[in-house]
């Protein structure tokens, strides 16, 4: 489902994040106090509560609008969840014209603002108090599973009550662990730089950044700050952890920093554990931060007063070479004091202020004295022009204070050499101005981002229109609130790398403008001071507009410098592009891994479905087989019952027929015996008839009795026979049933064995398919990683070469400026030498006149003409010799200065070339090491996958062998149990038969009955009984 359009509030969850009111009606008196890649931060007052707040305006239009919108939503969600004394307080958020207004708690400044104002490191107790507040805030964040990922002095804010606040959560991670490339380069932990290559990281990256911040507060800049930011990344990833010099700091502080900067995250303590460190818990004053803030405010006020006096001096005093030179000297000293500060101390993430000056300014400061001191005379003369350029821009400021939305006034007509000439600003000594070379606007000498090695020797081209010099007044506030919590506090507030630390404050500050002269309206009022009532005009401007005295320890020059540096987007775009590329790489990799995961899940689901279908088919087949067996058993039981009944019926019918035949034969025999007995008796006539009748009757009775006995015996025999045959039939049928059950069991077990073999074959097939998919997915992931690392290395090399080209071009420009300025400097020195020559000539002329007068007083008058001629010739000879000496001095000076300049430039070029080559070599070595580690990781992952596949195959085979063995055991057990059951049933039947009077042998004899086949029809069976007649029914001689 595609993401919603940036700024759309159709989603109720997103709409709930923003207030529905118009922020321009709620907040007033907006004053810009910070600037960065996200936009700007403003001081403001709420009309409803009269509360002072800071507003971070973030635009989500232009390139990557969807990404900007998601970043805004993430920061809002993050801030809404925080509730801790050491995190910035969230006030609300509004939407207006494609811009999000993020309203937060207002703070007076950041730790970087303090070192920027004082131009010197903080004390250990002050750093410890700041660390305690930071650790408390970090411990709270880490307990919620959050990571800040951009801890630095510029993001550590202070309130008027001395409470430390963590700000700028634009780079924060909502989940822990994380693995994205986010943060400010100089403060990044090694595991963040290597996040994509070596896995994830946790909240201990904030502990590393805190350690770097401690070094920043102790040395005014973080390690590797004189390097290109890209180069710093490679050094952080490869080199050992930075340390503090133990001679300058206590053991507890050095130990604390050393623990924070443990290279291995596992050895680095957590933020909660560091809260118990001796450095943080040792006794100190409870008001150490309050005193620091008060001292900083006092220093800022001193800066205001000093610069106000300078501005008044510029406006009120007529041009004077001596005064101008003094003023220019002060300005140059101030420029030197803040020279390195042109380089901001952070290249922030998308939500941090990005601002990086040219690092060559700080890395090449060793050549700052390569231009001869004589060249500075030119700049003493040029100070007046700087002051005029500054005064020409002041009028617009006061006017803008009344009308902040109006356009600035048009430029005044240009004077000589293209310099702007404000009305009433033409000096009485304008004839001298026409002979002076063009000089730069004071803006360039004070706050140019490209700080030259020798600020006294580089004079940029004149500006076509007056530009306001950036004042260092107590203007709003911290680094980009930034200072209030968002984005980019670091740039404005960090002190840069100014080498001037120590000495009186007045010698270490930049010339600034009072806070009440920061607007065009105020400047316009000050311009009126060039008239006779200038002093009254300045007082009126101050009274009318007030001192803008809202609480802050941030100077106006920081804000102005942020705005100027943000205009130089090249380095910002380069670093932002690099971060964006790393994030895109991470997103592509995550997307591919998610796709692989989804494909694997779908693959496993398909395989599981196929296997489940097979098992379901197996179950269905077994159920069908069991049903068939059950039906077969029931059918056979019915057949057995029917066969038993039929056999009983047939035997009964046969026996009835036998009895009928027996009765018929018995009657025949009885009749035959009766006739025979009658014949035999009738032949014996001697026996009386009565006796013969009695004898016949007796024989008849005996025969009937015998026949009755025979009949009874036959019935008993038939009964025993039918019972025996039925027992035999039942026994045989039981044996047949047992055999049939055995066959059914064998069929079932055979079916199960066949199914088990099919299941195992399918499992092996699935294993092969899964293995093939895993290898294919791993190959695609490895290929993507390799392509990404190659692209990343190409980008890094391209960025490094761009940086080298930029440094070389800037060095060439600097040398060209030095060469252009050299004739001016040499001309000034030549003029000084010629002036000395003229003064010497005047002195010698005076001495000659006095000497001539003395000689003529003692010389006779007739010889005076000759003496005068000789003295004149001597004078001409000495003056000629003196002129030649001065000309030779000028030539020697030209040659010496040219040689020194050439030599210093060659040395500077050589050092710069060596430094750039060293950085390129470090980058190449880092990339080679990175490639080697990446290849080793891929090989290791490949081996691990092969091992996993092999182990899985082994486990699968072991499982199949175990299942087969279990099946064999189950089959043997079931066969055994079935055999035992049948044996017991047969034994019980035989015992019952014995109890009924049947012997086992008689039961196992072959039956004389023809049983129907088990599968055949009982109707087709024939029962054949042995032939029986009456003669066989009686034993021989029974008659």
From Swiss-Prot:
**Which positions does UniProt annotate for ATP binding?**
33-41, 56
Bias-annotated ranges (Basic and acidic residues): 677-693
Q: Which GO terms describe its biological process?
A: apoptotic process; central complex development; follicle cell of egg chamber development; intestinal stem cell homeostasis; mushroom body development; negative regulation of BMP signaling pathway; negative regulation of organ growth; negative regulation of synaptic assembly at neuromuscular junction
Q: What is its main location?
A: cytoplasm
What domain of life? Eukaryota
Give the phenotype of cells or organisms lacking this gene.
Morphological defects in the follicular epithelium where cells in the anterior part of the epithelium stay cuboidal and fail to stretch. RNAi-mediated knockdown in eye and wing imaginal disks results in tissue overgrowth. It also gives rise to transcriptional up-regulation of a number of targets of the Hippo/SWH pathway. RNAi-mediated knockdown in wing imaginal disks results in strong elevation of yki activity. RNAi-mediated knockdown in the adult posterior midgut results in an increased number of intestinal stem cells.
Which keywords, in A-to-Z order, does the entry hold? ATP-binding, Cell projection, Coiled coil, Cytoplasm, Cytoskeleton, Kinase, Magnesium, Membrane, Nucleotide-binding, Serine/threonine-protein kinase, Transferase
Q: Where does this protein reside within or beyond the cell?
A: Cytoplasm, Cytoskeleton; Cytoplasm, Cytoskeleton, Spindle; Cytoplasm; Membrane
**Known catalysed reaction(s)?**
L-seryl-[protein] + ATP = O-phospho-L-seryl-[protein] + ADP + H(+); L-threonyl-[protein] + ATP = O-phospho-L-threonyl-[protein] + ADP + H(+)
Q: What is this protein called?
A: Serine/threonine-protein kinase Tao
Give the species this sequence originates from: Drosophila melanogaster
Q: What is the lineage of its organism?
A: Eukaryota, Metazoa, Ecdysozoa, Arthropoda, Hexapoda
